[in-house]
């Protein structure tokens, strides 16, 4: 049986996941999403994994959902489909998830990118929401997540036309944090993940929670949540280690305690 996602250790504390359906342009069928959820669940409970990098291949990150699978589903079947729960599991992953995008990230592939915390793009990266061409709309958060990221105007345009978004445009509008040479995309993403992996795990977790919560809470609620975590972290061993290392002029060794 084909290995739908290849998993490997890319650096100390960094798990690299590579989508592996090249003959289907890494189309995200249910089996692939289920596999991704299982790998993220394992990473969640593995203290050795501090950050995850998710990538595809040079030509294609993921070209959307698998239409051969979706075409068999009617409205009733779609109501019972497991996909929404799989997307929720991906969203619930508490450790940093970085996507390294080369080539096409279309439809569900674009939505998978929008589920990640940071995005590194190769110069050949291209994004789009082409569902309108099928008489549909994005069904895994494409309208909601993208609008919160780039605003209503651009999301309306891109979702209603299916226009392609270049890597340069993606960086300009905050879809990715950096555009790099295509052949170095994964390397840059792993370097970023390795840098994060050296930080205090507890602090990284609540930073992610605090920032993700901005679309779900008011400013006052967000500030309260931030302050609560600030006080909580003050009681951790990692905080003491960070302060001691600063005064002793050495690099801290964080243990997630």
What function would you assign to each model-found segment?
Residues 1-57, 88:
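Conserved CoA-thioester-binding segment of acyl-CoA-metabolizing enzymes
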Residues 4, 56-89, 105, 135, ...:
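Glycine- (often His-adjacent) and acidic-residue-rich active-site loop
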């Amino acid at each position: 049986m084909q290995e739908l996602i290849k998993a490997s250790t890319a650096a100390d504390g960094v798990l690299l996941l590579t989508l592996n359906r090249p003959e289907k342009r890494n189309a995200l069928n249910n089996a692939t999403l289920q596999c991704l959820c299982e790998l993220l669940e394992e990473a969640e409970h593995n203290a050795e994994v501090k950050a995850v990098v998710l990538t595809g291949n040079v030509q294609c990150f993921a070209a959307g959902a698998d239409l051969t699978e979706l075409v068999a589903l009617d409205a009733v079947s779609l109501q019972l489909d497991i996909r929404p729960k799989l997307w929720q599991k991906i969203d619930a992953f508490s450790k940093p998830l970085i996507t390294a995008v080369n080539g096409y990230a279309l439809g569900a592939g674009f939505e998978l990118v929008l589920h990640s915390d940071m995005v590194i793009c190769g110069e050949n990266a291209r994004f789009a929401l082409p569902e309108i061409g099928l008489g549909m709309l994005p069904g895994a958060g494409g309208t909601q997540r993208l609008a919160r990221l780039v605003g209503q105007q651009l999301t309306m345009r891109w979702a209603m036309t299916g226009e392609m978004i270049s890597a340069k445009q993606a960086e300009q509008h905050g879809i990715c944090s950096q555009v790099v040479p295509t052949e170095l995309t994964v390397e840059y993403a792993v370097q970023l993940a390795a840098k994060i992996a050296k930080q205090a795990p507890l602090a990284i977790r609540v930073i992610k929670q605090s920032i993700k919560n901005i679309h779900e809470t008011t400013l006052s609620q967000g500030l309260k949540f931030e302050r609560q975590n600030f006080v909580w972290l003050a009681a951790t061993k990692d905080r003491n280690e960070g302060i001691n290392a600063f005064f002793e002029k050495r690099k801290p060794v964080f243990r997630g305690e």
